Amino acid sequence: AIEIVDDEFNLSRREIINVPLLGQVAAGEPIFAEQNIEGYFPLLSEDMPSGEAFMLKVRGESMINIGIYDGDQIIVQKQNTASNGDLVVALVEDSATVKTFYKENGHYRLQPENDSMDPIIVDQVDILGKVTGLFRRYH
C-alpha cells in the first residue's frame, strides 16, 4: 500500500491556477484576445512564474537544439522586456515566435536554436513574455 507521510504532497491543500492556453494568432488581432484562448491548463501555483502567465503551443522546429519541439506547450511569464540570451515569445509582423533574444548594434536578433535556420533581424520587436517552462505529452 502507498501511504502519504508528508503534508507537502497533499494536493488538496495546494493552490491550482488555470493558465490560458493560446492558439494560433490571426494577423492584426491582439494575441490575448478571447477568441485566441483554446482552453486552460491547470498548474500548481508554486510551479508558476511570478506575475501573469500564459501558455502557447509550439509550431515548427526552430528551437530543437535546446529541446523545444513541435507540439510542446511552453509556459510564458507575461512581460514586455528581455535581456540578452533570454528565451522569449516575441511578436514579429503580427506573428508570435519563440526565439532567443539579443539586442545588438541598434537592432534586435531573434535567434532560432536550430543550425539550419537563420536569425530574424528587426529594428523593432514586441516582447510578449519570457519562457519559464515547458509541458510535453508523450504519445
Regions found by a protein language model. Give the residues of each.
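Short, positionally conserved secondary-structure boundary motifs
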Residues: A1-N65, K103, H107, R136-H139
